[in-house]
């Protein structure tokens, strides 16, 4: 019982501390007074902004919008099998009629059944190659069902062409995805013809001799982003959440709900008996071990950002004049929290996750922001 009660107390104390800090900044700005700790900077014209060399203790990783001459090498473990340059895509059998299709950056799933093929997602980057992949694994068969993982164009933007070439195809999605697509009015993303509702409420899709379980775990990457499980092949597909072997795309892949994102990742390995994970991106499939690795990284990131927020002093190193600018004080504070976060996780993770250096600043920025406005995710 004591363990269950400790987290709310920590959360309240953490949020109270941040609220007091924000109020102090705003009051100082309104009153026109500094927060102390001013140091002399370079000489600047009073009519324009200027900036100094980087902060103290800057990581040896280039910060955002600074040109990088050479990125860290991609570990061999993060690379998938080579793509045939002539075909421009590859198909990987996952067993029991399930197949991965990828051009190296995006992924789709095919499930071959007695009467046709179930297609999960239709990334425009793969485009017409999807139809060639269907013909390769199921000659003469049509796509009978198209399942949308979620509403984003980069994952289902070729759905309109799939619908045209497969008349009568059943398009399935969560009702939250339907709402987003109805608002978008995009002919390249036809509205679902069948939907399901609810959170943590499994929905079964049967096609010929195959069946899939669809479930919306709750807010994560985007409202309506679902888990697709094919029990026969022990394949789980969840898009834009787990990136096997790689750093997540920028800002947790632009997750709209970070606490929900954390909970979704945390639940996967205990919830599903799977051996193969399709994350929707890059050129290899994942495993339960990949999920555990990403969760461990997320845990370290969470701790590093929280520690940075708690130990970084507001206004330190700023001129007295700039400390009357509430936005500037907080920008400076967040910069230094981010530097603390990056420095904390780099030694352990920079050689374990591909593209760590590409998006580590983005992840720290998202994490500190979520901690400030959502509270702890762990």
Regions of interest found by a model, annotated:
Residues 262-326:
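Divalent-metal (often Zn2+) His-rich catalytic cores of metallo-beta-lactamase-fold enzymes
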Residues 88-136, 227-230, 234-239:
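Conserved beta-strand hairpin/beta-sheet module of binuclear metal-dependent hydrolase folds
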Residues 17-20, 29-115:
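Zn-dependent metallo-beta-lactamase
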Residues 15-16, 20, 32-59, 314-378:
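C-terminal regulatory/interaction regions
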Residues 176-224, 231-232, 262-266, 272:
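Metallo-beta-lactamase
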Residues 7-24:
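N-terminal Sec-pathway targeting helices
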Residues 120-123, 142-152, 172-175, 217, ...:
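Active-site neighborhood of phospho(di)ester-bond hydrolases with catalytic His/Asp-centered motifs
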Residues 40, 129-206:
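Active-site HxH/HxHxD metal-binding segment of metal-dependent hydrolases
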């Amino acid at each position: 019982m004591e363990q269950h009660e400790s987290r709310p107390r920590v959360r309240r104390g953490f949020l109270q501390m941040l609220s007091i800090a924000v109020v102090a900044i705003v009051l100082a700005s309104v009153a026109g007074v500094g927060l102390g700790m001013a140091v002399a900077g370079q000489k600047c014209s009073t009519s324009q902004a200027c900036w100094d060399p980087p902060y103290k203790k800057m990581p040896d990783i280039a910060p955002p919008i600074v040109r990088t001459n050479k990125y860290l090498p991609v570990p061999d473990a993060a690379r998938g099998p080579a793509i045939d340059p002539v075909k421009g895509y590859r198909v990987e059998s996952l067993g029991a009629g399930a197949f991965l299709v990828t051009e190296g950056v995006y992924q789709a799933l095919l499930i071959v059944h007695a009467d046709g093929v179930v297609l999960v997602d239709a990334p425009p980057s793969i485009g017409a190659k999807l139809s060639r992949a269907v013909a390769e694994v199921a000659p003469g068969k049509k796509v009978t069902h198209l399942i949308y993982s979620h509403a984003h164009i980069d994952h289902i933007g070729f759905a309109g062409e799939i619908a045209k070439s497969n008349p009568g195809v059943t398009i399935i999605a969560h009702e939250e995805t339907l709402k987003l697509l109805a608002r978008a009015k995009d002919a390249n993303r036809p509205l679902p013809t069948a939907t399901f509702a609810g959170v943590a409420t499994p929905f079964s899709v049967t096609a010929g001799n195959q069946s899939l379980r669809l479930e919306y775990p709750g807010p994560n990457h985007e409202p309506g982003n679902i888990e697709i499980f094919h029990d026969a092949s022990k394949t789980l597909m969840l898009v834009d959440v787990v990136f096997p072997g790689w750093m997540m795309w920028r800002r947790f892949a632009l997750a709209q709900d970070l606490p929900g994102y954390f909970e979704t990742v945390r639940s996967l390995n205990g919830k599903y008996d799977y051996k193969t994970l399709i994350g929707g991106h890059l050129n290899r499939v994942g495993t339960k071990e990949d999920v555990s690795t990403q969760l461990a990284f997320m845990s370290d990131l969470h701790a590093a950002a929280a520690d940075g927020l708690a130990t970084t002093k507001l206004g330190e190193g700023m001129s007295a004049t700039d400390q009357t600018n509430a936005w500037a004080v907080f920008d400076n504070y967040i910069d230094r929290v981010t530097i603390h976060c990056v420095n904390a996780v780099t030694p352990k993770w920079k050689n374990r996750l591909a593209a760590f250096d590409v998006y580590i600043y983005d992840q720290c920025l998202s994490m500190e922001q979520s901690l400030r406005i959502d509270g702890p995710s762990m």
